[in-house]
Amino acid sequence: MLNTLEPQPCETDALSPRLQRSTGSARVVMRRKADGTTALADLAQQGCAKAMLPRVHAPVPEVVFLNTAGGVTGGDSLSYRLDLEAGAQATGATQTAERTYRSSAGTGEMRVHLTLGSGARLDWLPQETILFDGSATRRCTEVEMAADATLLWCETLVFGRAAMGEALSRFAFRDDRQVRRDGKLVLWEPLTLDATHLAPRACLGGARAIATVAFLAPDAEAARDTVRRLAPEGVDWAVSAWDGKLVLRAFAPDAQPLKHALAQVLHVLREGASLPRVWQL
């Protein structure tokens, strides 16, 4: 029965001893200073995962994560963690689109863990994840936030590069997104996709790019009607809001119009703040 389901931590496949694998993890801690600004408190990184804090002319710092391996394939393991202490504010992003390449053996693993202390605000805006034919990937994103914290989260999936004439005939992607507010599970989105889900109208209906925007804040519902009115021609989306949450789901025939549409939504939910420079719109 549906009501007996419980979110489970992602399991990690054993790495194949026959092929070289990419492994990396990066962790950043941001802290609110006495003057009210947010600054780096701790940074640790290893392997192919890197974290950078570019110089920005804005009151809120940006934390940019990078996978120097250039993508994820079977047996790879990539982990990002971003912790905001009480009152801290930051924008998190990835330096470029993440690519999941053809897998010869095993599953590529990606993990993201985000924590928000009391009164903290995090805008987690990674660039799109591009799925390639033959890829096998599992991603798990876990968020732990205080009751009065604010989270803006945008996640985009692209099914092959349309400009390159790519079509996906075989792939496997599993995504598990969990948000706990004050210890209570308030958003859980398990997603399993393969090539059979691309064409049917009851699934993706031929869309080449999909996105989810989640906004969790005490007054999140107030933005619902404004976000609904932003829906552009050529991009299908629906918006719902309840219990301090706003969720938008969007479908488009190509990634570029979807990204431009998302930029308008994020501009509103970020109260006019510019997008991270790495988005390069």
Swiss-Prot record:
Q: Which family would the database say this protein is a member of?
A: Belongs to the UreD family.
What this protein is called in its record is: Urease accessory protein UreD
Which GO molecular function terms does the record list? nickel cation binding
Q: Where in the cell is it found?
A: Cytoplasm
Q: What species was this sequence derived from?
A: Dinoroseobacter shibae (strain DSM 16493 / NCIMB 14021 / DFL 12)
Is this entry keyworded Magnesium? Answer: no
Please state the gene responsible for encoding this protein. ureD
Q: Which UniProt keywords apply?
A: Chaperone, Cytoplasm, Nickel insertion
Q: Subunit structure of this entry?
A: UreD, UreF and UreG form a complex that acts as a GTP-hydrolysis-dependent molecular chaperone, activating the urease apoprotein by helping to assemble the nickel containing metallocenter of UreC. The UreE protein probably delivers the nickel.
